[in-house]
Structure formats: structure tokens, C-alpha cells
Amino acid sequence: MTTSLREDRSSSIGWLIAAGVAGGMLAARAALRARRLYDLRGKVVLITGGSRGLGLALARAFAHEGARIAVCARDAREIERARDDLASRGIEAFGTPCDLTERAGVERLVREVRARYGRIDVLVNNAGLIQVGPMETMTPADYEESLRIHFWAPLYTMLAVLPEMRRRRSGRIVNISSVGGKISMAHLLPYCSGKFALTGLSEGMRAALLQDNVVVTTVCPGLLRTGSPRNAFFKGRHRAEYSWFSISDSLPILSMGAARAARQIVTACKRGDAELVIPTMAKVWVTVNALFPGLMTDLLGSLERSLPQPGGIGSARERGARSGSALSPSPLTLLGDSAAVRHNEI
């Protein structure tokens, strides 16, 4: 046998072994998913930030699977509107106001949900806050606020429900991070800092809790059509910032509908997936960033130059709903504006 033939044969065997290993890994993954499949019928699901946006869409999606729903938010009026929305769909939900950045308030929330339903089977940490503007307009207080909401609040809720879940050796936790918790963006620096912290916390919690059969899923959404830009905060040239952000949030190529996203998140929770990145465009960004981090950083730096520069109201901030312009609302934001009505963002 010539050297060339021996090399060809060795190469073929190598490819066969690699294919066999890959096939075995896929089969093992499918078997593990099947073993972990979680029946949501009758389960109690607590959703933070559940009064509007993605949180409200998740409440509807979990209820569709037969779960019993509890939601919390800061604004009691928003909670009442959310309960009315769910009731109109035949869904009974418990709702209560809570400041998640206060640990005592979180513990009170968990006691109230247990008093109503007897237990908590699934925790969804969804509450969040978006701050948009150039780096120069952001203050230390903005970073502290983001960490309180995106890191400390989820930590408090997890610590409050974990003793019960670990005793039962059963439970699910879904942490809604962001593609901004994988790739940092210049005009979202406090937000991304908080979401990076949540991603790290969530991944570490999964590793720590698998032995107790408490399964943690980290969700990293990109742009979702929930209408949430109306309730985000904008700094600097706030009208221009709101325009680019709300238009991006409305474009079908870049964004995903909230109901579809919620269904995928519920499926990931049931299967016990480690991570879910949605939509497809966000998966592409995360993959490129993992393979070529320098390239992605340079691309984002180039994008920064096309975004609004410092000025306007400076480090003061204004809600998106008060930052309209000729570009937003407009036909370019039609999908996002319609979503805001459906998901209680108005």
C-alpha cells in the first residue's frame, strides 16, 4: 500500500470517528432533554416584570401550557391592566407590586405567592430597565441602577425560592438576560454591564444546582417586538436615540415578535436547555463574536460613529414615550407601535 493510500484511509477513518462522536453527542443530548422534559400543567410560575412586554407574553404562554401564573411589577396599575388582559383570555393570575431591588420586598413577594398557591415551581427573572445614550451621558448611578435591577434583583429572587426547590429536588429558573449580556454595545453600556453580570450569575447557578435537579436556563434575546422602547430611558440627543432604537426594534429582519419569543422560551424551560439565543440575527452576532471577538468589537466601534453624538439633554433622561420625532412614531415603527398596544406598554 502506498503512502498516499494509507494517508487517505487514515483520513477517512478519522472522519468516521468524528462523525460517530458527533452523532453520539447529539443522541445523548436528545436523551437528556427527554429525561429533563418538564410538565408545566398545574405548576406555579412566578414572572417578575410580568405586567407588560415580554413578561406579559410569557404569562400568556406559560398559562397556555396549563401553568398557574403569578406576576409582579413596581406599578400596581400596570398589574391590574395585565390581570384584566389575562382574564379576558380565561387566565386567572395573581399579581402584586414589588420593588425587586429590596431583598425584604422580594421575600415578602415569595411569601405572598406561596400563601396563594402553596409553592413556586418556576421562577422567571424578566424584570429589566433599558438606558440608551452615549458613554459620556452615563453616570455611575446609571451603572448602579442597572446592576440592582439586572443582577441583585434576580439574585434575591433566586435565593428566596431555592430552599424550597432544593428540598423538593425539583424546579426551573429562567433568567432573561440579553444579547447585550454577550456582546457589549457602546450606547447601552450600563444595560450591557448589568446583563453581562446576570449571564455569569445564571450560568454559574446552573452548574451549582444541577445536582439538586433545579435547572437554570439563560435566555439572551436580541430585539423583540414588545413596544418596550416607549418605556426605556434615553439620554443626550434623546429624540435621535429613540428614533434609531425604536426603528431597529420594529424591523422584521432584526427583531422577533414577542409571542413567538415567549413560546420558544417556554419550550427551552420545559426542555431544561442551558441557553437560548433569539432571534436568528442575534445568534449570528453571538457566534461571530465568539469566533472573532476583535472583528465584532471593531464593527461595533464603526457603528458607534453613526449613532447620535453627545449633546441634547446630556446626562438627564427622558422616556421613549416622550421622545418622539418625525421618524418615530412613523411607518418605520408600525410593528413596534402595534406591539406596544398588545403588550400593555402604553
Positions of the model-derived regions?
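Conserved glycine-rich Rossmann-like NAD(P)H-binding loop of the short-chain dehydrogenase/reductase
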Residues: E65-R81
